Amino acid sequence: MAKHQFQTEVGQLLHLMTHSLYSNKEIFIRELVSNASDAIDKLNYLRLTDENLKDKYAQWKGEINISFDEKDKSLSIIDNGIGMNEADLIASIGTIAKSGTKSFVEALTGDAKKDSNLIGQFGVGFYSVFMVADKVDVISKKAGEEQAYKWSSTGTGEFDLTPCTKESNGTVIYIKLKDEEAGEFASKYRIKNIVEKYSNHIAYPIFLNYDEEVSEALSEEDEKAGKKPEKKIERKHEQINAATALWMQPKAKLKEQDYNDFYKSISHDSSDPMLTIHTKTEGVNEYTTLFYIPKIAPMDMYRADFQSGVKLYVKRVFITDDEKELLPTYLRFVRGIIDSEDLPLNVSREILQENRILANIKQGSVKKILAEIKKLSKDEEKYAEFVAQYIRPLKEGVYQDYTNKEAILELLRYKSSKTEAGKMTSLEAYKERANSEQKAIYYIVGENEKVLRNSPLLESYKKNDIEVLILDDKEIDEIITPAIGAFKEWEFKDITAIEPPKVEQSEEEKKEVEEKFQDILSKIKDKLGDAVKDVKVTSRLSESPSCVVKDAADAQMAAMAHMFRAMGQAMPESAPILEINPEHEIVKKLNGCADEATIEDVSWILLDQAKLSEGMEITDTVAFAQRLSRITAKAL
């Protein structure tokens, strides 16, 4: 017998399972049945594509069996799927690879019911069995191999792994139930209820095996003689699920509850979906899709190793659930099924990535999903829930999917200078509100909505009744928005990198102002040195003394700078342009000041104050405070 230590995070997870997540213990059956179904899917695929397995499994049919023993306080879940060898058991149960227990632990909220719903999303569903088990034995034999193995654990820090004997391929999970759980889960009616609730539309039959006391039928003579029927114990073998490919059934026959139950069985989510999209397509390519959008974004949505939520079938035969190219990455939150009538069963991953049929299915699926999201957008309340969860990946779509760029832009929602806090606007609504002379969409990017709404750069736009989009998700908006270019011929313009809206000032008046302040502009630039690219007078301000802007070239470099930072590489920040308001009292007094020390202090205050107003960092907060103190003292 070989003893193995659990991966550190697994031990931590098992402790959580047994001590924290009490509220929804029944999900362990859902998780183990889903795993059994996946194992059968894999063997079903291999027997049709692997020459070494075709003959041996020609008559094979996948099924799942559940047995229980009230006296023994035990429960067994058995499948005849692909099975596991020694390496598989260590990789699948002894460690957690892709989804990461650390992320699971970090995502825990302290709400036991919510936390139990995270189990499946993080691919740690097997371990949920330790919520109800004193001990678990996993006996498995891999298809095409001779040796079977037994994995055993009490859910503490280690597990045993030993060779054993098993006649056929597949996996048996024997669960020795805790005393307090046996009454609930070693029960025919409870098991049937749980399977019907979570796994009714698993594609393979699920049989419940149990002993039942029955009375033998009496003959007419024995009945007349008053004899009592003899009782005996019969072994029952009852199918307890529908075992149908739900997506192939006509939509007219399916109820919302059918769709919701199936979603829960494939997504490991205990909530109903936000949106269900069921489509059968005929023509050049014939395929059926059943897509779901979850109410809550998948926990791994922003991980590079996110798990694809879409399964590919060919004529009801499972092919893969690990192909991220079935849908574009900006739709990685979508869950569901694609079932093709035209793809070959032995399609390889390389062929999948270049296959014309699959490319057509992908294109058609994307258009359908976007069209259904657009329908959802007509309900403002429901669409606000969608936007709260998925606006970021949708924005990625603008960058990734030129074909559907316009359709995606119609789905985007933005905060703006004319919307209340918590409300958002579409680009179409923005256009409709604009005055007849406006032919551009103006925006400002930053990290804090309140700071952006109070930015001095908005002053001239408010004065001219021009709406500005408030983009407070800088991490993505700084990259994506410049790439949009235009929406229905209206160009996107960053107000930090363009001239302000027209003001009632002739060229002659403008020139006169510049000449009047030429000397002080030169002095300010000299005092600030490399901290600024230039110093100018501006007409964009009505209340603030100064602001900072970028020139057009620097605005284009912002996205590149962000990408460099994301890769951990430094890229020097471009110095801003400082603009001062010639109508402001501070600037007027500064223009007539002869004290060089005061000019230097005020110059730096104008720059640092402008940067703070845009949510930017200032290089020397101590010096800023000292300058303010000196200027305040002089003013008293």
Swiss-Prot record:
Question: Mind listing the GO molecular function terms for this protein?
Answer: ATP binding; ATP hydrolysis activity; ATP-dependent protein folding chaperone; unfolded protein binding
For the keyword Cytoplasm, the answer is: yes
- Please name the InterPro entries in this protein's record: HATPase_C_sf, HSP90_C, Hsp90_fam, Hsp90_N, Ribosomal_Su5_D2-typ_SF
Annotated region described as C, given as residue ranges: 563-636
Main location class: cytoplasm
Q: Gene that codes for this?
A: htpG
Family classification: Belongs to the heat shock protein 90 family.
Which region is the signal sequence?
none
UniProt protein name: Chaperone protein HtpG
Compartmental location: Cytoplasm
Role of this protein:
Molecular chaperone. Has ATPase activity.
Domain of life from the UniProt record: Bacteria
The beginning of the lineage is: Bacteria, Pseudomonadati, Campylobacterota, Epsilonproteobacteria, Campylobacterales
How is this protein annotated for GO cellular component?
cytoplasm
Spell out the subunit comment.
Answer: Homodimer.
| Region of interest (B), ranges | 350-562
Q: Which UniProt keywords apply?
A: ATP-binding, Chaperone, Cytoplasm, Nucleotide-binding, Stress response
Annotated stretches, region: A = 1-349
